[in-house]
């Protein structure tokens, strides 16, 4: 129940979520919705915002992202976090380890709302995964969910539902 989750997070005043699942299932969109429910701005960071070719640059950018979110009292979203937070045991370079260590350090001391999204949960560092309060898998809609969404949209947009609703069951990997 997403409403209950947002209410619980709001009451707690902080939380660390990891949303995972196939592409197009609404992970990033959920973060926008959650920020609105929490009445906070959303700060979204992608690997391109954080990765830096200079020694210590990525670590600096990670720390700056957390500081910005703290200053703005925002929900901090790391989108597609697997692109820079991979398992340290498979690291080929020392900087891969230090950027994960920096993220873990920042994550431990952060007292706000943190959300990470990934399509590749199995590639992420285990120490990082343990630090999330909740890991939630978002899947494609079931046939019943797709039909329910279609019916709700029909009601909202005032059109009648006919036999075309049965065609939804033929479409795979629908997302909201």
Segments from the language model and where they lie:
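Walker A/P-loop NTP-binding motif of AAA+ ATPase domains
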Residues: 1-169
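The conserved phosphate-sensing helix
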Residues: 171-176
């Amino acid at each position: 129940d997403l409403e209950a989750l947002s209410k619980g997070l709001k009451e707690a005043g902080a939380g660390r979520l990891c949303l995972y699942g196939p592409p197009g299932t609404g992970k990033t969109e959920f973060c926008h919705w959650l920020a609105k429910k929490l009445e906070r701005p959303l700060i979204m960071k992608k690997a391109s915002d954080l990765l830096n070719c200079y020694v210590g640059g990525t670590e600096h950018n990670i720390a700056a992202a957390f500081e910005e979110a703290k200053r703005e009292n925002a929900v901090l979203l790391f989108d597609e976090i697997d692109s820079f937070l991979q398992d340290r045991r498979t690291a080929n370079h020392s900087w891969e380890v230090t950027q994960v260590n920096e993220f873990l350090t920042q994550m431990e001391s952060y007292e706000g709302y943190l959300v990470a999204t990934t399509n590749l949960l199995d590639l992420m560092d285990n120490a990082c995964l343990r630090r999330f309060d909740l890991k939630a898998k978002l899947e494609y809609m079931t046939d019943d969910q797709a039909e329910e969404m279609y019916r709700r949209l029909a009601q909202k947009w005032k059109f009648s539902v006919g036999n075309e609703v049965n065609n939804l069951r033929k479409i795979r990997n629908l997302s909201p």
